[in-house]
């Protein structure tokens, strides 16, 4: 008898039915407010993608197809970009960025460029890792609006040349930092290393306690690692706010490749 997926049960509980507006284009806020799972297919040259996965920045033309709530049919050309560091070399499928604004007529164009977080390997164990990381994002959404929203996909990766067998797995799309900033009347702030004393103390405390709670040491404001900064549009004296991401190295997820820092 197949073991019960407890993270998936919790996710199912959190994913209540939400009404999606009847529109022919995507609202980038409502897209992440809707919690239903999207059945999607990404078609690309899988042979080339796997062969060049360790080359960050390489781009691959692809196609994204799905049917969204409200009977919105999506069949758009997209551009995949290889990203990431550790997982790019370790995992069978590299971390990717999906450019929905690749074509002006794209239904998904308002979403811009989104990170696609996929399973590291094709196994039930790695599926659980993905569900756990997804759950961390959803929990943090409940704590603060200054957080990345995510949308779960039931994803099929298909080879455009038909030479490689399709891969079916779960994945999730992660909101762009510009959208996070906009929701909070802020703007994204690009900078290098930052002294933790020079960011908003209250928000920094929330981040630090949450990272401690999930057992994650793979982050740092001072080294510009797995954190983004947003700053108020209205108050020029307000210190920047920290927004964390990438939780696969946390003890909560407990991947077989994660090693805590000394």
What are these model-predicted stretches?
Residues 1-23:
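Bacterial Sec-dependent N-terminal signal peptides
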């Amino acid at each position: 008898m197949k073991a019960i997926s407890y993270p998936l049960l919790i996710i199912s509980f959190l994913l209540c039915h939400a009404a999606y507006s009847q529109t022919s284009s995507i609202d980038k806020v409502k897209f992440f407010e809707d919690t239903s799972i999207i059945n999607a297919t990404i078609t690309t040259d899988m042979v080339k993608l796997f062969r060049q996965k360790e080359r960050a920045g390489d781009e691959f033309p692809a196609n994204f197809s799905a049917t969204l709530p409200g009977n919105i049919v999506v069949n758009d050309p997209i551009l995949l970009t290889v990203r990431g560091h550790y997982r790019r070399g370790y995992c069978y499928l590299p971390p990717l960025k999906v450019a929905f604004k690749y074509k002006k007529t794209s239904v998904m164009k308002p979403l811009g460029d989104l990170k696609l977080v996929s399973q590291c390997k094709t196994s039930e164990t790695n599926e659980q890792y993905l569900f756990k990381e997804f759950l961390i994002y959803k929990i943090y959404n409940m704590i603060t609006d200054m957080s990345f929203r995510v949308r779960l996909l039931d994803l099929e990766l298909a080879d455009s040349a038909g030479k490689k067998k399709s891969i079916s797995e779960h994945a999730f799309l992660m909101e762009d930092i510009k959208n996070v900033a906009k929701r909070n009347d802020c703007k994204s702030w690009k900078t290098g290393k930052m002294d933790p004393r020079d960011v908003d103390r209250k928000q920094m405390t929330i981040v630090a306690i949450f990272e401690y709670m999930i057992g994650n040491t793979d982050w740092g404001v001072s080294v510009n690692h797995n954190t983004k900064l947003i700053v108020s549009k209205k108050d020029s004296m307000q210190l920047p706010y920290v927004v964390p991401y990438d939780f696969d190295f946390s003890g909560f997820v407990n991947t077989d490749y994660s090693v805590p820092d000394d």
